[in-house]
């Protein structure tokens, strides 16, 4: 490239980066984003304390300002049995659903009211006391996504891929937890 072409490329880069930055500056956060941030913060603090775990992620699905999904991810010391994991996941999902459905300010922005387990995602990433990953035969991740509870294993031979996933419907898991608490 000659000097003129290099100069033109540099000038174009500055012009284009200026356009992109001006677009970013024009973004206005929707009103409901503040409500959702408060909801996620309050729920996560409550669940952290109740289940002795640490929040490591949050998520909001809000295409065109319509709230379709709320997510929380936690790190917890394990291993956990399926029964223990199920009870925690069900408790987390129920807390999120109740908190969202009680909040009248957010209702007009919800895709559906009442909010259900299909609108909530909860993930528990399990670690040893030393902070290491947990491998099969114990669960490494327990999650609730789209109304299903998943129990995932990783093998130490292939730690980047889940070697086994067990699944149950959230409603079934909820009934099992409720029946267990009646005993």
Regions found by a protein language model. Give the residues of each.
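Short, flexible loop/turn elements at secondary-structure junctions
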Residues: 2, 76-78, 126
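Short edge beta-strands and adjacent turn/loop segments
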Residues: 37, 45-79
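Bacterial N-terminal signal peptides that target proteins for export
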Residues: 1-8
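Polar/charged, Gly/Pro-rich intrinsically disordered segments
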Residues: 105-183
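N-terminal presequence-like segments and adjacent domain-start helices
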Residues: 19-44
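Bacterial N-terminal signal peptides
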Residues: 9-17
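Solvent-exposed, acidic/flexible segments
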Residues: 29, 33-36, 65, 78-89
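Short, non-transmembrane amphipathic alpha-helical segments
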Residues: 40-43, 82-111
């Amino acid at each position: 490239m000659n000097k003129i072409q290099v100069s033109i490329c540099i000038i174009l880069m500055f012009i284009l980066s200026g356009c992109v930055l001006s677009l970013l500056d024009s973004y206005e956060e929707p009103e409901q984003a503040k409500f959702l941030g408060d909801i996620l913060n309050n729920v996560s603090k409550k669940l952290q304390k109740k289940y002795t775990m640490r929040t490591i992620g949050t998520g909001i699905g809000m295409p065109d300002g319509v709230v379709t999904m709320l997510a929380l991810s936690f790190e917890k010391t394990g291993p956990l049995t399926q029964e223990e994991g199920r009870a925690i996941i069900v408790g987390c999902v129920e807390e999120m659903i109740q908190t969202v459905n009680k909040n009248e300010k957010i209702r007009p922005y919800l895709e559906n009211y009442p909010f259900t387990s299909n609108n909530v995602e909860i993930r528990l990433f399990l670690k040893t006391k030393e902070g290491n990953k947990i491998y099969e035969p114990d669960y490494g991740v327990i999650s609730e996504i789209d109304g299903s509870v998943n129990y995932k294993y990783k093998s130490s031979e292939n730690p980047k891929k889940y070697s086994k996933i067990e699944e149950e419907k959230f409603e079934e898991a909820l009934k099992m937890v409720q029946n267990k608490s009646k005993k």
